[in-house]
């Protein structure tokens, strides 16, 4: 009889296999950003072709500008783990990370930038393992069903944004990202989850009823 994976199996798999890898990448990006900031740069990019354990291109940029009220995760942040693009052409899976921060928040809020970077890095790495069979990235048991139609309907506003958070691929990625952030902050995972849901509710993305459902 095939053994059914439990929630603890899922969490422990992420902890044992990918946390050290996520830590290495997070540290490399963060050190590049810090060095660029100290050298007076206002747009600091880190890019790399990852070929160890997983295969994907990593692009991570932070913009330091007064147009941002505080700290923001900018649109365009995300991952595409597919072997083929929308036109059916072969592509290398990729992770793009774009952060923006007001210069008045630095250097005091670098620790918050780091914690958010850890969350996003681990979140997007989880997406890489949900696809990319030809690249050897897909890991058995991960949700791989095509959810592009649901995502499109949500983006068009035809379905509530809360549905996005309940897509199987997003549930797994959110849990691993928030778990990893909590580990870095040395806090309980529930604290990281509640803080994330607080920001979504306060931003009007979800309401109280949807929060309970999530």
Predicted features along the sequence, with ranges:
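Short acidic, low-complexity intrinsically disordered linear motifs used
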Residues: 1-14
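Short, intrinsically disordered, charge-balanced linker/junction segments flanking boundaries
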Residues: 10, 85-87, 210-214
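Auxiliary, metal-adjacent structural segments of Zn-dependent hydrolase domains
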Residues: 17-95
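Long, well-structured alpha-helical subdomains associated
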Residues: 31-37, 149-214
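Active-site scaffold of zinc-dependent metalloenzymes
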Residues: 72-115, 128-132
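Hydrophobic (often cysteine-bearing) scaffold residues that line and stabilize catalytic clefts
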Residues: 114, 118, 169
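Post-HEXXH active-site segment of zinc metalloproteases
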Residues: 115, 131-165
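Active-site recognition of the HExxH zinc-binding catalytic motif
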Residues: 119-132, 173
């Amino acid at each position: 009889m095939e053994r059914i994976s439990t929630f603890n199996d899922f969490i422990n798999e992420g902890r044992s296999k990918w946390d050290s890898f996520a830590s290495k990448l997070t540290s490399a990006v963060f050190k590049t950003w810090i060095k660029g900031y100290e050298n007076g740069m206002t747009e600091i990019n880190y890019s790399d072709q990852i070929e160890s354990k997983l295969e994907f291109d990593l692009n991570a940029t932070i913009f330091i500008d007064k147009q941002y009220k505080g700290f923001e995760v900018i649109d365009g942040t995300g991952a595409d783990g597919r072997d083929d693009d929308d036109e059916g052409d072969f592509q290398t899976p990729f992770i793009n990370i774009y952060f923006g921060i007001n210069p008045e928040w630095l250097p005091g809020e670098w620790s918050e930038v780091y914690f958010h970077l850890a969350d996003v890095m681990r979140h997007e790495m989880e997406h890489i393992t949900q696809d990319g069979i030809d690249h050897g990235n897909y890991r058995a048991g991960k949700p791989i069903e095509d959810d592009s139609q649901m995502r499109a309907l949500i983006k068009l506003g035809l379905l509530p944004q809360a549905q996005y958070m309940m897509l199987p691929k997003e549930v797994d990625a959110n849990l691993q990202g928030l778990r990893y952030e909590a580990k870095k902050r040395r806090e309980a995972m529930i604290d990281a989850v509640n803080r994330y849901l607080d920001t979504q509710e306060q931003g009007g993305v979800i309401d109280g009823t949807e929060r309970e459902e999530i």
